[in-house]
A protein has these predicted regions:
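Long, low-complexity, polar and repeat-rich extracellular regions
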Residues: 1-247
Length: 247
């Protein structure tokens, strides 16, 4: 098995025009770092029982493909602080049984998805955007934190047996079915804290819509309404704040 100690660094204005594959039991005791104006045009794939400690996209770096970790392989963390419009343009998929921590303050163009038995921790902060939404279809537990000024588009979907905990002070968009949070699985979803925002032009609340066959297993602990510019009539009906859950 191949073993590499140290980081793989793509820096300045260097470009990697193909996929990066860590496979066949290879071990990278360090990380893949894309920094400066570095660009990686292909995908990053960790497969075949291989491992790498981390993937970092920083500076004005751009990764144009997706990041995939296959079953029995290992990636501990992904950090995206890139200020480029591209950021990481593809999806991030963890099929493994190894916990993955994702920290984003830049742009992730695709979906973040966990399909395996591993836990996943997602922190979206400092104006970060996750355009493709978040999906948990495996058995690993997922923790999602979306900070003020940050955005998750296309909703949060649970279709496995995992426990998912959500804390949201930012913006979470709706999926194609109009749901903010969907539970179609046998797992549970706990909304630990959620700030409901107000449309500054209309005064309407951005209602949290909970849907899916398992919506009865979505529990809300704390919900706060940002009342700046709110039409007070909106506050008369709890369904303007959150709908689809037992109240």
């Amino acid at each position: 098995n191949t073993k590499l100690e140290g980081n793989i660094i793509n820096a300045d204005s260097a470009s990697i025009g193909s996929d990066i594959k860590i496979e066949d039991g290879a071990k990278v005791e360090g990380g893949l770092v894309n920094q400066g104006n570095g660009s990686i045009s292909g995908s990053v794939q960790v497969s075949g029982g291989s491992s790498i400690d981390s993937i970092t996209n920083t500076g004005n770096g751009a990764i144009s493909g997706s990041i995939t970790v296959d079953k029995d392989s290992k990636l501990d963390s992904i950090t995206n602080t890139s200020t480029s419009d591209t950021g990481i343009s593809g999806s991030i998929t963890n099929n493994s049984d190894n916990k993955l921590e994702i920290s984003n303050s830049g742009n992730i163009g695709g979906k973040i998805e966990s399909t395996g038995s591993a836990d996943m921790v997602i922190s979206n902060s400092n104006g970060g955007t996750i355009s493709g939404g978040i999906s948990s279809s495996g058995s690993g537990n997922t923790s999602i934190s979306n900070s003020q000024g940050s955005t998750i588009n296309n909703g949060i979907t649970v279709s496995g047996s995992a426990q998912v905990e959500i804390s949201n002070q930012g913006s979470v968009g709706k999926d194609e079915n109009g749901n903010t949070v969907t539970n179609n699985g046998s797992g549970s979803v706990g909304i630990k804290d959620w700030v409901v925002s107000t449309d500054k032009d209309t005064g309407k609340l951005d209602t949290v819509v909970v849907g899916g066959s398992g919506k009865d297993n979505v529990k809300v602990e704390n919900i706060t309404v940002d009342q700046s510019n709110v039409d007070l009539d909106e506050l008369d009906n709890i369904n303007h704040i959150i709908s689809g859950v037992n109240q």
